A protein has these predicted regions:
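N-terminal glycine-rich FAD/FM-binding segment characteristic of electron-transfer flavoproteins
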Residues: 1-195
Length: 195
């Protein structure tokens, strides 16, 4: 089964609005494509009650499963030097078809580096759409990029490329609840550097 990973930014102990939108978009396309939505939480030290509260909120935002790493190394703003090893470990384990970052600092800082590390296509400033089925093809996912690295608009059909896609999504309004607060959660250890 295909998987979609949505990096989920937390601010003031709640999901950042752009991350809520990214989760809602992941949920919308996953339902049409039969994919599993993984929310990735990269947190500094957090109490078990705090993690449980966030997990409930992330579940209602649209995640099927939640991957959470709470470690001192992840405290502070998202940076490739601190968050990149976790993203690489998740990508290696899940081999997602699509990785979504919310618009803003996290996507700008982490998205391009993750795409390079995973040999994935990187599409900044994007939106997602489902192209309807026709007589010759089933419905398929497309990522519409408003400004790629060359400043061009382009639409990428995921079936037409043979590698994963990392995209930063333009923010929009997210519905208040799409899933259940009791999503499956797994705690991850912070990856130790390879020697």
């Amino acid at each position: 089964m295909a998987s979609i990973v949505a990096y989920t930014e937390i601010r003031d102990a709640t999901i950042a609005p752009a991350s809520r939108f990214a989760l809602a978009e992941a949920r919308r396309i996953a339902d049409d494509l039969g994919a599993t939505v993984y929310a990735l939480l990269a947190l500094g030290p957090t109490t078990p009650d705090g993690i449980a509260a966030l997990a409930g909120e992330v579940g209602t935002a649209g995640a099927d499963r939640i991957l959470c790493c709470a470690d001192e190394a992840l405290q502070g703003p998202p940076r490739d030097a601190t968050h990149g090893p976790l993203l690489a470990a998740v990508a290696e384990r899940l081999r997602p078809t699509l990785v979504l970052f919310p618009e803003g600092d996290a996507g700008a800082e982490l998205g391009r580096a993750m795409a390079a590390r995973a040999e994935a296509a990187f599409l900044p400033d994007s939106s997602l759409e489902i192209l309807p089925a026709n007589d010759s093809e089933p419905a398929q996912l497309a990522v519409r990029c408003e400004h790629d690295d060359q400043g061009e608009k382009r639409v990428v059909r995921l079936r037409e490329i043979e590698r994963p896609v990392v995209a930063t999504l333009r923010a929009g309004a997210a519905p208040p609840a799409l899933g259940e607060p009791a999503s499956e959660m797994e705690m991850l250890n912070y990856p130790t550097p390879r020697s």
